[in-house]
A protein has these predicted regions:
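Structural preference for beta-strand elements that scaffold enzyme active sites
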Residues: 24, 80-82, 159-161
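Basic/polar, cationic surfaces and motifs that engage anionic cell-wall
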Residues: 3-7, 14-18, 93-192
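Feature marks short, surface-exposed loop/turn motifs that line or immediately flank catalytic pockets
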Residues: 33, 89-91, 168
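Peptidoglycan-targeting cell-wall enzymes and recognition modules
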Residues: 42-121
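N-terminal catalytic cores of peptidoglycan-degrading enzymes
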Residues: 1-77
Length: 192
């Protein structure tokens, strides 16, 4: 059997087709402040890919076709549209500093401090999520919880979620992207 994943320009553009339509958007943070060029290099080095990268400026860079499966969230999440938002995510340790404001949030039932996305990033993410929801017929909903969803909950989910909802090993995007969508009118819904 031949490998269906073919590397082109460093990303897996000829990946298998997604289920039609993709069931959800998966929000991530990059864990670094570099732009889409740096994100591209890191993804290639790690054998990963995403559909979009959200720059600090608010620009959204499309990295893969929407009908292709990208390797961004393990087997459960890779059926969704992956969106990496440029941010270190967590405040740097001294003596380093960040120009981003800090925000209190929770992840997997624990309090944490994360770095806020820029207002332009939040606006771009919301606009992209709205466009994807319209295109794929998703309800405008996010999980009302910061816990890992069960496999059954993931298989039934439609709308947006974050990487932290798919595995206990990840904390991105700290419920910040779900929060931005709720402020824009999306509904927090129980995944049960």
């Amino acid at each position: 059997m031949t490998d269906p994943w073919i590397k082109r320009d460093g990303l897996w553009f000829d990946a298998p087709k997604l289920v039609s339509p993709p069931p959800f958007l998966v929000g991530h943070w990059t864990a670094g402040e570099g732009g889409s060029d740096r994100v591209h290099r890191v993804l290639v080095q790690r054998g990963l890919s995403v559909h979009f990268v959200g720059e600090s400026s608010g620009s959204m860079v499309q990295m893969a076709d929407l009908d292709r499966r990208c390797a961004h969230a393990g087997s459960r999440g890779n059926v969704g549209i992956g969106v990496e938002m440029v941010s270190a995510g967590l405040p740097p340790k001294p003596p380093k500093a960040s120009t981003r404001s800090k925000v209190a949030t929770t992840c997997h039932g624990r309090d944490m401090t994360a770095l806020a996305f820029t207002p332009a990033q939040e606006a771009a993410f919301v606009a992209l999520a709205e466009a994807l929801a319209s295109r794929f017929g998703w309800p405008r909903q996010v999980p009302d919880t910061d816990r890992v969803l069960t496999p059954g909950e993931i298989s039934r989910w439609r709308g947006a979620l974050e990487h932290l909802h798919l595995t206990a090993r990840k904390i991105d995007a700290g419920m910040l992207l779900c929060g931005a969508l709720v402020r824009a009118g999306w509904k927090p819904v129980s995944p049960r």
